[in-house]
Amino acid sequence: MFNNLTQRFLKIIKKISNKGRLTEKNIKETLREIRIALLEADVALPVVKNFIPSIQKSVIGNQVNKSLTPGQELIKIVKKELTLILGKENHSLNLSVTPPAIILMIGLQGSGKTTTTAKLGQLIRTKYKKKVIVTSIDIYRLAAIKQLKMLSKQAKISFFPSNNTQSPKDIVQHAIQHAKLKFYDVLLIDTAGRLQIDKKMMNELLDVYNISHPIETFFVADAMFGQDSINVINEFNKYLPVSSFIITKTDSDTRAGIILSIKYLTKKPIKFIGTGEKLEELELFYPDRIASRILGMGDMLSLIENIENKIDKKHIKKFSNTIKKYNTFNFNDMLLHINQIKKIGGVNSILGKLPKTQTIFNSFQNNIDENILLKMKTIINSMTISERHQPELIKGSRKRRISLGSGIPIPEINQLLKQFNNIKKIMKTIKKGGVTKIMQGINNIIKNKF
């Protein structure tokens, strides 16, 4: 979701980097461009009005580090100020209470609240090692109850049943009693999404809040709603205290306004962000890492954590050995790597966390079609065992047979063979330690995608 803003910042940084030093004139011009970039990204005006003077004060008030270029100095200052606006530090869940710890999920209809409830349940089960149960009090939409039941099964967490003949208060009371009897650590309550601020429904929500005494009341906000969500949040806050936020659909091609505005305007932290549709695509929110991502510096820590949590240690060891013996790399290895890439969120998730230069950014500023991986798998699965082990065997007649078997045209099979050879070259470069050449190699693969 930061693509447009990141591109603007990269251009601004490149422009100031060409200057010999920071002067009052080029600082003023740069701040004007940053202001426009933030407003176009739908960042709230009060946030921008605070942000720009803070940068100006830091640039002019601090002695410029002589070892840094103007561009580096600007990045350092802007990253610091962005981190402050985003929340300064990470706020994690505190589940150190007498069980069950109750979490209330509230928000507008269509924000992804039910899916997020299941995602959070799975994250608490896997990361915090807690016994989790979920329930729905959305008696106005039976599909929501069925959806949560199905998702809870996928997330390997328990589901407490409910139906539209019960009142939300009764469901919550019975769910709490059940959670205590069965020694659950955490109870997640998915509430009915609101289309508007309805007094009757808000009072109903307040009753549930007073009965459950939640340790967290998460407002689930859709990133695509933009800063308009702030007004809705303030209305919710009049009835019951919102404690923190989960921002969903941050993988969408939308502006970053809500993420950059919500903490400053509400004084409540963002704790999680939804980065995709899959249950595992919910991440802890780290303000400093998001600031780095916005400035094109990447988020290598999150990428490393993702790899450590989701990729088999045996695969990492095998990949390391493959690099050492890059000449033995074959299509069986490639198929294994494709499956691992899908595990950590796909190509776009990885690229989104890599550091960017303007050149590299231009190569993948538009999302890469994840179906590329599916095509690759289909082609490889249409090869014989000997062809997978010895790709050099794949010539004219074999290509035609693979094309017929996979239903994919020969030019795209040629493209896969070309990419396979590019990957081998990158492995050779990694072994020799050439980082710049590695990035150029990745850049070439991206440019030559299907």
Curated annotation (Swiss-Prot):
UniProt key word Ribonucleoprotein: yes
The EC number(s) this enzyme carries: 3.6.5.4
SMART domains: AAA, SRP54, SRP54_N
Keyword Hydrolase tagged: yes
Binding annotation for GTP: 107-114, 190-194, 248-251
Annotated Gene3D superfamilies: P-loop containing nucleotide triphosphate hydrolases (3.40.50.300), Signal recognition particle SRP54, nucleotide-binding domain (1.20.120.140), Signal recognition particle, SRP54 subunit, M-domain (1.10.260.30)
GO terms for MF: 7S RNA binding; ATP hydrolysis activity; GTP binding; GTPase activity
Record GO cellular component, one term: signal recognition particle
Location of this chain's protein in the cell: Cytoplasm
A biological-process GO annotation: SRP-dependent cotranslational protein targeting to membrane
Cross-referenced InterPro entries: AAA+_ATPase, P-loop_NTPase, Signal_recog_part_SRP54_M_sf, Signal_recog_particl_SRP54_hlx, Signal_recog_particle_SRP54_M, SRP, SRP/SRP_N, SRP54
Primary localization: cytoplasm
Subunit composition and interactions: Part of the signal recognition particle protein translocation system, which is composed of SRP and FtsY. SRP is a ribonucleoprotein composed of Ffh and a 4.5S RNA molecule.
Family membership noted in the UniProt record: Belongs to the GTP-binding SRP family. SRP54 subfamily.
Domain notes: Composed of three domains: the N-terminal N domain, which is responsible for interactions with the ribosome, the central G domain, which binds GTP, and the C-terminal M domain, which binds the RNA and the signal sequence of the RNC.
Its job: Involved in targeting and insertion of nascent membrane proteins into the cytoplasmic membrane. Binds to the hydrophobic signal sequence of the ribosome-nascent chain (RNC) as it emerges from the ribosomes. The SRP-RNC complex is then targeted to the cytoplasmic membrane where it interacts with the SRP receptor FtsY. Interaction with FtsY leads to the transfer of the RNC complex to the Sec translocase for insertion into the membrane, the hydrolysis of GTP by both Ffh and FtsY, and the dissociation of the SRP-FtsY complex into the individual components.
NCBIfam families: ffh
Full protein name: Signal recognition particle protein
Organism whose genome encodes this protein: Buchnera aphidicola subsp. Baizongia pistaciae (strain Bp)
